[in-house]
Amino acid sequence: QIEERVKRIPLVKSCEAHHDFSGVISVSVKEYKPIARIVRSTIGTSPFPDQYISEDGKFIGTSPLFTPRIIVTGGPYFDGKRDLQDRRGRTLIPFFQFIENNEFWKAQISQIIVAKDGGIVLIPTLGTTRIDFGLPMNIENKFKKLFIFYQKVIPNKGWNKYSWVQLKYKNQVICE
C-alpha cells in the first residue's frame, strides 16, 4: 500500500518499501529528473495540463509542492503528445539535456518553442531577437555559432539590432 501511494506522486519513477524484523519500514524512491516544462496553450487542442519532460522523454505531472528551475517549452509540436518516444521526439531529448547541463545556455534561454515539424525557436532572456535553431541536429555546432554571435556581434550591434537569427544552415549565421 505504501509503494502504491508513493508511486502516485508525479515525480516518482519507482518505489520499494520493506520492513525489517523490528518493524522499521524503509522506503526507497527513485525520482524522474525533469529537463524541461511544457506549458500548454489554453487555445491549443491539447487536453493535457502542463507537464515536465523527464530525461528519458516521458511526460510527468507537475507538483504543487515543488517547481524545479528548468527550461520552459511549448508550441504546436506538443499538442496531443503524451511523451517524446516517437522518432522526432527522441531528437528533442538531447537538445533539452544540452541546455539543462550547460549553465550559460540555461541562463541565456528563457523559452523554447517547438513547431509542428520539430523546428525550434529560442526566446533569449535578454533582447528581442528570436533565434531560429531549426531541427535539433548538430546541437553543439549550432550553439557554438550562437556563442560566436554573442561574442562578436552583440557587443558591436546591441541586443535588439536583429529580430531574427537563423542557425539552421550549415556554417552560416543569418541575421535579419
Predicted regions mapped to residue ranges:
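Charged, solvent-exposed interaction patches on well-folded alpha/beta domains
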Residues: E3-R8, K13-E176
